[in-house]
């Protein structure tokens, strides 16, 4: 049975949950001269996988993490990597805005709860994205502040310490099982909502019960879950 949602704080992943994550379009443009269109999706998958591996290593600022993941993907594909490739892709991150379902939902939630962001982001990127969300946030917490990225436990423990509350009082919301829902579960966050934007393959029979989360298809469903 899923736990009743009665949070003191609602924390959110940013990129891919609130902010429309758009790293693939500029990557397609940058590498159009080196990767055929019929292979581009596979290259993008590898780039994503290396980002997922890079967050587990020694801390580095997010722009450098993206560049290093891109460099590793290029090495795997035996194609040239140029420093300008990574710079061009990283430069678009602060331009990303919210998904269409986000502003109204956040505005409604902000009337009842203090909202928090916990993002794998650098300080010089995230605030431009947050400004576009149009809602007040009690705290914006980043990987740069924590010295670690999700899914590392250190990032979540940093948030718990900054909020000064018990983890049972935090409702954590994310579109990623890998980066957020699974580590939050292992850290015994009892209140979790998975925003299923279709990024990750989910076998409901295999995952929902072990990780004990509520699920919505987009953020507009979250106020309803909370009875607002």
List PLM regions with ranges.
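N-terminal helical cap/lid subdomain that shapes the substrate entry/recognition surface
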Residues: 2-100, 124
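Asp-based, Mg2+/Mn2+-dependent phosphohydrolase catalytic module
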Residues: 1-9, 103, 107, 113-228
